[in-house]
UniProtKB/Swiss-Prot annotation:
Entry's Gene Ontology molecular function annotations: ATP binding; N-acetylglucosamine kinase activity; zinc ion binding
Name the record gives this protein: N-acetyl-D-glucosamine kinase
Gene that this polypeptide is encoded by: nagK
Record flagged with keyword Nucleotide-binding: yes
Pathway(s): Cell wall biogenesis; peptidoglycan recycling
Domain of life of the organism encoding this protein: Bacteria
Sequence positions that bind Zn(2+): H157, C177, C179, C184
């Protein structure tokens, strides 16, 4: 059995998957914030419960936001302060008496989709998350590409390209990102960015679902906004796809529920790619909230 943990600032979710990659059991508990020992206890207790329920000693994979293992072997995860700065992988491996694998949660999302029965035919899979922020991951031949700093796929921290400014206007405001840089594309393409763009152009403060509802009702202003957003997304993805050239692009996160993104993006991409380039197949993520657990569990399938 393969145990996959999706750990975030509010919850620890465990999913248990069998050899056919089917979910057999899952459980969620709140993420402890009081101490590192309480955090370790929460993870270990879930593993013990799974072992007992299923009568096996399953392998353990963990997806967590941030850098799973820095040069000194410690975790960097600002959203999980109880464990950040601690040697999480080594400590859990010792307590659980088994190999524990860690990776960035966005890489786990991409790995989950790459191992979907429909998608295993594609050698290079790019996962793109359009949620609170913008992130993603790359999977080559069933294995995540992490890079030495675990930042492969941090697409949201690429800067706006020149073509984006041509589209939006050279007086378009470059917003400061939480990473400290100016003009990171997640400030414009995330769910928050989608809403910010609407407020910038129309001086109305609406959340993304409200804007999408107006678009579905045929509102002209919402229609113009969505057209602009899709063009901006295509411009930015054109740069990324020219570098990565994936066979498949899978889009997840809250905005992936907006069908116009997956249905209309393909027709806008070619003008931003090299003439000889082929646009990837574009699909919405298949596994929703279970994707993080699936991908973490499948870290043990990548040998």
């Amino acid at each position: 059995m393969y145990y996959g943990f999706d750990i975030g600032g509010t919850k620890i979710a465990l999913g248990v998957f069998d050899s056919t990659r089917r979910l057999q059991w899952e459980k969620r508990v709140p993420t402890p914030h009081t101490s590192y020992s309480a955090f370790l206890d929460a993870v270990c207790e879930l593993v013990a419960e799974a072992d007992q329920r299923l009568g096996v000693k399953g392998s353990v994979g963990i997806g967590i936001p941030g850098m799973p293992e820095t040069e000194d072997g410690t975790l960097y995860a600002a959203n999980v302060p109880a464990a950040s700065g601690k040697p999480l992988r080594a400590d859990l491996s010792a307590r659980l008496d088994r190999d524990v694998r860690l990776d960035n949660d966005a890489n786990c999302f991409a790995l989950s989709e790459a191992w979907d029965d429909e998608f295993t035919q594609y050698p290079l899979v790019m996962g793109l998350i359009l949620g609170t922020g913008v992130g993603g991951g790359l999977v080559l031949n069933g294995k995540p590409i992490t890079g030495q700093s675990y930042i492969t796929g941090e697409f949201g921290h690429m800067r706006l390209p020149v073509d984006a400014l041509t589209l939006m206007g050279f007086d378009f405001p470059l917003r400061r990102c939480g990473c400290g840089q100016m003009g990171c594309i997640e400030n414009y393409l995330s769910g928050r960015g989608f809403a910010w763009l609407y407020q910038h152009y129309y001086d109305q403060s609406l959340q993304a679902p409200e804007i999408i509802a107006l678009w579905e009702q045929g509102d002209e202003q919402a229609h113009a906004h969505v057209e602009r957003y899709l063009d901006l997304l295509a411009v930015c993805l054109g740069n990324i796809l020219t570098i990565v050239d994936p066979d498949l692009l899978v889009i997840g996160g809250g905005l992936s529920n907006f069908t116009a993104i997956t249905t209309q993006l393909a027709e806008r991409l070619p003008r931003h790619l090299l003439p000889v380039a082929r646009a990837p197949r574009i699909e919405r993520a298949r596994h929703g909230d279970a994707g993080g657990m699936r991908g973490a569990a499948f870290l043990h399938l990548t040998d």
